[in-house]
């Protein structure tokens, strides 16, 4: 039986140790995300056979487990996940798998899981130098937006700190209010996550930056290190009616805060056509492929 518990700040050290043992951790394997997403779902963690196991229960009751992370006994940890999922008697799946992970699951449990590639959840991985320099013809539109911003606005950039976090939260709330999205529930949930992340900003080791126009915060971004080489951007907000704000905060943040990282992980697009177009327009070095698995019950139907 897996001894799950709610993630606490005291779990940070051992969880990060397990994450650092991975070849290339993706956004699911981030202590900041695990801790902050408890604002909108029931997340539990445990050490099982030397691996990190994460269990997420969504508001609709569906349960997903992260593939075991770390250098422990992955096969035994997987067996415990399967036992836990079946024992609960509710629909469940396993997510956050790379190709190697999916092959391990298939080798040991192919008879009870539908395993599939999940393009909507692939992380976009960029070279930090590309995001900083924006060289070449393909980045000309980005440079044009930035040039307009620099020439037409009285702007400043600064690091996010305890002093300006309240202004960032106020800006995020205003951004949501102005949003034209028909279904605002996902954005409202995101705001809950952002607020929790800011509440523990320093303790979680986040890095962030913001833009001001005439003293007013109009954009911010924040994230955390996944490894010595990879920084993961969790959130990025800018007012859409201010031309160049998104392009500017992206470039300023990478230039000022992320020069020591080789890669910048800007997470997935969740299947959003507009978000996918925006992420592809920055020409990722590669996509971190992901696979998901859904448990198939005894009558051969997906749960």
Language-model segments: residues:
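Short catalytic-loop micro-motif centered on adjacent basic/acidic residues
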Residues: 93-94, 158, 263-266
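Conserved donor-binding loop and adjoining core beta-sheet/short helix segment
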Residues: 28-100, 212-242
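Aromatic (often tryptophan-rich) hydrophobic motifs at membrane interfaces
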Residues: 206-296
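Short, conserved active-site entrance elements at the starts or edges of catalytic domains
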Residues: 163, 167-216
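Short, glycine/charge-rich beta-strand/loop segments that flank catalytic centers
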Residues: 91-108, 119-122
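Non-cleavable N-terminal signal-anchor transmembrane helices
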Residues: 1-55, 298-303
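Acyltransferase donor/substrate-recognition loop-hinge adjacent to the catalytic core
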Residues: 110-184
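Conserved active-site alpha-helix within GNAT-family acetyltransferase domains
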Residues: 101-115, 144, 271-287
């Amino acid at each position: 039986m897996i001894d799950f518990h709610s993630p606490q700040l005291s779990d940070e050290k051992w969880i990060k140790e397990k994450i650092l043992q991975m070849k290339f951790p993706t956004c699911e394997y981030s202590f900041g995300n695990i801790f902050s997403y408890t604002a909108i779902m029931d997340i539990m963690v445990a050490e099982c056979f030397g691996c990190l196991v994460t269990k997420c229960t969504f508001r609709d009751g569906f349960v997903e487990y992260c593939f075991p992370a770390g250098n422990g006994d992955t096969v035994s940890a997987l067996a415990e996940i399967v036992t836990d999922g079946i024992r609960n008697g509710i629909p469940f799946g396993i997510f956050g798998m790379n190709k190697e992970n999916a092959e391990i699951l298939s080798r040991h449990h192919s008879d009870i899981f539908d395993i599939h590639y999940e393009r909507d959840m692939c992380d976009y991985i960029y070279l930090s130098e590309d995001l900083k320099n924006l060289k070449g013809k393909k980045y000309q539109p980005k440079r044009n937006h930035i040039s307009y911003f620099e020439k037409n606005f009285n702007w400043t950039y600064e690091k996010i700190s305890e002093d300006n976090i309240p202004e960032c939260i106020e800006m995020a709330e205003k951004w949501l209010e102005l949003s034209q999205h028909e279904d605002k529930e996902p954005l409202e949930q995101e705001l809950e996550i952002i607020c929790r992340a800011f509440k523990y900003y320093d303790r979680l080791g986040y890095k962030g930056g913001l833009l001001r126009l005439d003293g007013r915060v109009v954009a911010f971004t924040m994230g955390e290190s996944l490894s010595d080489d990879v920084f993961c951007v969790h959130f990025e907000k800018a007012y859409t009616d201010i031309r160049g704000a998104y392009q500017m905060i992206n470039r300023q943040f990478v230039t000022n805060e992320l020069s020591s990282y080789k890669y910048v992980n800007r997470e997935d697009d969740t299947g959003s056509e507009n978000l996918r177009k925006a992420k592809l327009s920055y020409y990722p070095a590669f996509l971190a492929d992901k696979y998901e698995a859904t448990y198939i019950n005894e009558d051969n139907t997906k749960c």
